[in-house]
Amino acid sequence: MNHEGSRSLYDRALSVLPGGVNSAVRAAPQPYPVFADHGDGGHVIDADGNRYIDWIQGLGPLLLGHDMPEQLQAAVQSRASEGPMYGMPSEIEVEHAEFVCRHVPSVEMIRFVNSGTEATVSACRLARAATGRNKIVVMQGGYHGAQESTLVEGDADDVAPSSAGIPQSFAEHTIPVPFNDPEAASEVFRAHGDDIAAVLVEPVQANMGIVYPEDGYHEALRSLCDDYGSLLIFDEVITGFRVGGLQCAQGKFDIDPDITTFGKIIGGGFPVGAIGGKTEYIEQFTPSGDVFQAGTFSGHPVTMAAGLETLKFCAEEDVYDHVNELGRQLREGLSDIVADQAPEYTVVGTDSLFKVVFTRGDGTPQGEACRNGCRQSSDCSRYGTCPTSATDVRDAETDRYARLFRPKMIEEGVLVSQNQFESNFVSYRHTAEDVEETLEAYKEAL
């Protein structure tokens, strides 16, 4: 493949953008990333005219692929032509909120913002105000946006900021615990329960190698929060309206969080975030309460129209059946390939998420119980050795994925996530043929 166009654009970008990009993950692979020109269904065409099967899908927002359905396109164009924004409330905000509240059981009220980061920042502030406490429990290695409260590393006894520019005092109010370890969570509650405002957790660790929860884990977190008067916050920025359909991952796992953060799909491909939950908490945001929250572009009419029409399309068409079936085909096909070529690796994912984690092991392949992606099943021959937390994913061959595997996939005409941690995403515009070609590319690249 010729990549001179991308190389040239990257050289230009380096002179005006830090690292040549506007989000760090986009800089992969080095020495230069692929620059997109336009999307086409489940594919992307780059600056040199190369066509790729695209499993990045904007890192999650594009459940319907790169082509907007006719009604979605019409709604967006209509809103833009009527004046893109007003600085005043509009009916489309109310309609979108009503749709979400009807379909997500735990959401009685919602506040729209502009990004997943903004949503989690606001959710943490809200939890602290509602409980009168300071500490937030998070999962080690998890990601909840570019915010000071959750950019931490270490463990409960030795926590530090994970980025330059964050005072140590911020980290002191955050307690990292391993995902899938209820005893570790219980221990920090026994030590700090009177000052824990909330537990903030992705129902599936989709930002850290798609780690699936063990049976009973979320129930344990729910019980701890109830026992100590803390709030349970589900970060569904990635899983929301993708895992578990319109009821989201909380519906799939039958868990009732107090607060949920949303992003990505809820905006139909446009910048968005949202904080939803019980009325007693959400109405504490200003102006009805004392927890300050505001934003010039919050509830942007174009974004609201795109998000609402996306969710309505999902409700009326076979979107979830289609993407989940292709996800199953990918995971099972990858399990067969990995068993033959790299049995120490782990196939992960659920619904329309998939990935291969380059785990190190003794070569024992995943069992039939986890052929459709690791489920932390005790019936699997690899139970207890597959990744159960972000730490396990970090211990995988992350460098080999970035240096060798992903560049080879690009040359095979397939775009997969930029690193070992981000998910791959199936869209409604992907086809069975895309799946077959992708599996063949994996055979070559592995």
UniProtKB/Swiss-Prot annotation:
It holds the Pfam family Aminotran_3. Pathway: Porphyrin-containing compound metabolism; protoporphyrin-IX biosynthesis; 5-aminolevulinate from L-glutamyl-tRNA(Glu): step 2/2. Its cofactor is pyridoxal 5'-phosphate. Its main location: cytoplasm. GO terms for molecular function: glutamate-1-semialdehyde 2,1-aminomutase activity; pyridoxal phosphate binding; transaminase activity. It catalyses: (S)-4-amino-5-oxopentanoate = 5-aminolevulinate. Its EC number is 5.4.3.8. It is found in: Cytoplasm. GO terms for cellular component: cytoplasm. Keywords: Cytoplasm, Isomerase, Porphyrin biosynthesis, Pyridoxal phosphate. The modification N6-(pyridoxal phosphate)lysine is found at K264. The keyword tRNA-binding does not apply. GO terms for biological process: protoporphyrinogen IX biosynthetic process. NCBIfam families: PRK00062.1. Belongs to the class-III pyridoxal-phosphate-dependent aminotransferase family. HemL subfamily. This is Glutamate-1-semialdehyde 2,1-aminomutase. It comes from Natronomonas pharaonis (strain ATCC 35678 / DSM 2160 / CIP 103997 / JCM 8858 / NBRC 14720 / NCIMB 2260 / Gabara).
